[in-house]
A protein has these predicted regions:
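Sec-dependent N-terminal signal peptides
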Residues: 4-13
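C-terminal segment of classical bacterial N-terminal signal peptides
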Residues: 14-18
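N-terminal amphipathic, basic helical "cap/leader" segment at the start of enzyme domains
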Residues: 19-130
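Small-aliphatic-rich amphipathic alpha-helix that forms the alpha element of a beta-alpha
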Residues: 45, 64, 91, 132-143, ...
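Solvent-exposed coil/turn segments that connect beta secondary-structure elements
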Residues: 69, 96-98, 105, 137-141, ...
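Short coil/turn connectors at secondary-structure junctions
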Residues: 128-131, 196-198
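A glycine-rich helix N-cap at a beta->alpha junction
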Residues: 192-210
Length: 210
């Protein structure tokens, strides 16, 4: 019996060790009671293009991503509504140390690319300064059977996610803005996206520059 328990504990520890070696970051749980009242956040919501390079704490990053694409229910439904619950959206996270893919089910950052690649998230220089840049990607094959419907649904899904991030930023005194001026073809290649996957827009997040 003791040998069985020791063996189980060994494999648990080994799994955790391997996860750390891969650079995966398990995010802290969001604080559901923090921040300003919702109605106040509506009034404070702003688009800001002026960012401090000060790093964001992991707790803030956790809550930004939860707002953007977090799982809220046991059946896997999220903070963001999608048509027929398609859940066709991915959120790539660009930071100074690399690019990660957000895993909402596990609330974790999965390493994707090494190095500071924030400059590829938009044509404006502030993308390289903001400590966190989200890039929203949509699987177009999962939404609708015409280009018009695909564009409509993809924009709606990413728009809902970005508004969640806007309201969270307002709640925490952060700066953010949605950016459509970006080289989508270059990002598609960089992120090794499939033919049916499309970059929608980016959204830098950080402390406002004083």
């Amino acid at each position: 019996m003791k040998k069985s328990v020791i063996l189980v504990l060994f494999f648990v520890a080994l799994t955790a060790f391997c996860g750390e070696n891969k650079g995966e970051k398990i995010l802290p749980k969001p604080d559901m009671k923090s921040g300003k009242p919702l109605m106040e956040c509506f009034a404070l919501r702003r688009s800001s293009r002026s960012f401090s390079s000060k790093p964001l704490p992991l707790q803030i990053i956790s809550e930004v991503l939860f707002a953007a694409d977090g799982v809220t229910r046991a059946d896997g439904r999220k903070t963001v509504p999608t048509a027929r619950n398609m859940q066709n959206q991915k959120v790539y996270v660009f930071m100074a140390d690399g690019v990660y893919l957000y895993d909402g089910k596990r609330h974790a950052l999965v390493p994707f690319l090494k190095g500071d690649l924030r400059k590829h998230c938009g044509t404006q220089a502030f993308h390289s300064k903001a400590p966190l840049v989200l890039v929203f990607v949509s699987d177009m094959s999962a939404i609708g059977n015409t280009p018009e419907l695909q564009s409509l649904y993809a924009g709606n899904h990413s728009g809902s996610a970005s508004q969640n991030v806007y309201l969270y930023a307002a709640s925490k005194g952060l700066a953010t803005v949605v950016c459509g001026l970006l080289d989508r073809s270059k990002l598609k290649t960089l992120l090794k996206l499939k033919d049916n996957e499309q970059v929608i827009f980016s959204q830098p997040v950080g402390y406002p520059r004083k």
